[in-house]
Amino acid sequence: MASRGVNKVILVGNLGKDPEVRYMPNGNAVANFTVATSESWKDQQGQPQERTEWHNIVMYRRLAEIAGEYLKKGSKIYIEGKLQTSKWQDQATGQDRYKTEINASEMQMLDSRGQGGGQQGGGDYGQQQNQYNAPQQQAPQQGYAPKPQSAPQQPAYAPKPQSAPQQPAQQQGGYQSQGQQPQAPAYAPKPQAAPQQRPAPAPQQAAPQQNFTPDLDDGWDDDIPF
């Protein structure tokens, strides 16, 4: 499988001139400017040396409009993009001309406030998905961190727990029962007397039966005929 390759450029440098913004017939903006990058080193004799490279930058659409509005000569920026080479024919000589530029897709302004023509730094801009963030003002740096509020201190002493009311020990058999069973009072309640029952009524005696014996002398003989 053949590799498609990578075409990506990252630059951090300063603008050599103000951006030139123009509009194409379809209404899209195009911005052109140059960015200088410098590198320094020491030669064999220990003398410092410096070399500056100039890069041609092109931006399109909304990113080009932002560059024309915020960037000035000397502004320090961060750029991501890709290399592209344009070809055209010279009208005077008829020869082909070539120009290699960096087609920038993302940009970040690195100047702090007050530098680069008084602009505000820290803005991130990109052409992908048409997302653009306005430059943000840097908040003043504080030399200290706010002291966290301490939690309210609790008293150094703990309240003495209240003891449960003591119950008299159970005196049965000379020992205490084990466990957490409630203890009975040391005295036994006086048993209540059972209610007195009335004596059952005596059975009534039957009236004595009288044995009637007729008196033989009382006129019985009058009815007997002889």
Swiss-Prot record:
Q: Where is this motif: Important for interaction with partner proteins?
A: 221-226
Q: Which InterPro entries match?
A: NA-bd_OB-fold (IPR012340), Primosome_PriB/ssb (IPR000424), ssDNA-bd (IPR011344)
What task does this protein carry out?
Plays an important role in DNA replication, recombination and repair. Binds to ssDNA and to an array of partner proteins to recruit them to their sites of action during DNA metabolism.
Q: Where is this region: Disordered?
A: 111-226
Q: Where is the composition biased (Acidic residues)?
A: 215-226
PANTHER family linked to this entry:
SINGLE-STRANDED DNA-BINDING PROTEIN
User: Its gene?
Assistant: ssb
Highest taxon, organism lineage? Bacteria
Q: Which GO molecular function terms does the record list?
A: single-stranded DNA binding
Q: Which residues lie in Gly residues bias regions?
A: 114-125
Gene Ontology cellular component list: nucleoid
Which residue numbers delimit the SSB domain? 6-111
* Name of the protein in question: Single-stranded DNA-binding protein
Kindly state the subunit structure of this protein. Answer: Homotetramer.
Which HAMAP family does this one have?
Answer: SSB
The answer to whether keyword DNA repair applies is: yes
Q: Which GO terms describe its biological process?
A: DNA recombination; DNA repair; DNA replication
Keyword annotations of the record: DNA damage, DNA recombination, DNA repair, DNA replication, DNA-binding
Spell out the Low complexity composition-biased ranges.
Answer: 126-210
